[in-house]
Amino acid sequence: MLVEKFLKDFTIPEKIEFLKSQGDGSYGKFTIYPFERGFGITIGNTLRRVLLSSIEGYAITAMRVQSNNKDSSSKVVSSEFDLIPGVSEDTLEIIANIKNIHLKLGEGEQRKTISFSVSGKDTNVLKASHFERDGVEVFNKDLVIATLSHDVNLDLEFQINYGRGYVSSEQNSKYLEEVNVIALDSIFSPIEKVSYSVEDTRVGQRSDYDKLVMEIWTTGVISAKDAIKKAASIVREFLFPLVDFEDNVNTSFEKSKSESSNLLDMSIEKLNLSVRSLNCLAKENVRTLGELISKNAEELSKARNFGKKSLEEIIEKLGSYRLYLGMSKEDALSVLSKNVKISE
């Protein structure tokens, strides 16, 4: 093969050394060598950009706060500009603190709602450690979220999702169906910082080869070692189609477009919904994925015997494929063309 013959004239990295790490794996220093001159910068910059932009993680995407005071009055916070009675910080500051919580769910979980209450009589400080419940693991437990007065009780509810990169509150609000729930901007990336440098290294008589030195800091949600493995896999997947360029260039777009259209005609039974949800949808003549996403939450909620749990189940299942109720066909095709596999 031409590619294999071409690579025979290149020096390919043979050594990958893991030089340093912290006990929790959140920091790692790696050296990779030897590279042909110039390839150290090319590979280092590529890995750095992928690490910072494309490693998936968890974030809190929505919250509901109710403040209960000793005079029996209560208030549900309706927006980020509302003040929370009995709390020193304003809501915007609290939201900023919440976005800094480093957490993850159990293996395979992509969405979870947690609810809990906290009383000023028991503690005057709400910390990230209070979020560690129901299978949620928190990595910066001492982070202060809010300061409470002695006579306040807070009822709290938070939505945690799995995702990638940055998602605005406007996008997250598409998945909210209850009033007085505040959608948050979400930063899913578990990577805090990446740096790299390129040094000279010797191979035989030549000393002008590149040695790539990379340092990775994570939030603890993923180890530095797993992060660099995942980044390398992402780069490989994006470049692999170019290896068989002639075979792929003429067929890939039409194939993905066709497969995406077929998925919209797929029976909703393949979404593995509960029998109750399937029966309710059948009564509304919703039988395909395309028909389902064309409905909005309000339409489904008005259907007979269609309860909150069924709606939440459907929203969660669609969300796992990056789809949502009320989505346009064009947007759905665009999403599905990038990931056309749905479990059979």
From Swiss-Prot:
- Region Alpha C-terminal domain (alpha-CTD): which residues? 259-344
Ranges for the region named Alpha N-terminal domain (alpha-NTD) are 1-246
Top-rank taxon: Bacteria
Reaction catalysed by this chain?
RNA(n) + a ribonucleoside 5'-triphosphate = RNA(n+1) + diphosphate
Q: What are the GO BP annotations of this UniProt entry?
A: DNA-templated transcription
Q: Listed GO cellular component terms?
A: cytosol; DNA-directed RNA polymerase complex
Is Transcription among the key words of this record? Answer: yes
Going by the record, the broad EC class of this enzyme is: transferase
Tell me which EC number(s) this protein carries: 2.7.7.6
Molecular function (Gene Ontology), one example = DNA-directed RNA polymerase activity
Listed SUPFAM superfamilies:
C-terminal domain of RNA polymerase alpha subunit, Insert subdomain of RNA polymerase alpha subunit, RBP11-like subunits of RNA polymerase
- Entry keyword Repressor: no
Instruction: Copy the domain comment.
Output: The N-terminal domain is essential for RNAP assembly and basal transcription, whereas the C-terminal domain is involved in interaction with transcriptional regulators and with upstream promoter elements.
Q: Which family does it belong to?
A: Belongs to the RNA polymerase alpha chain family.
* Purpose: DNA-dependent RNA polymerase catalyzes the transcription of DNA into RNA using the four ribonucleoside triphosphates as substrates.
Known partners and oligomeric status: Homodimer. The RNAP catalytic core consists of 2 alpha, 1 beta, 1 beta' and 1 omega subunit. When a sigma factor is associated with the core the holoenzyme is formed, which can initiate transcription.
What NCBIfam families does the database record attribute to this sequence? PRK05182.1-2, PRK05182.2-5, rpoA
Name assigned to this protein: DNA-directed RNA polymerase subunit alpha
Recorded source organism is Borreliella burgdorferi (strain ATCC 35210 / DSM 4680 / CIP 102532 / B31)
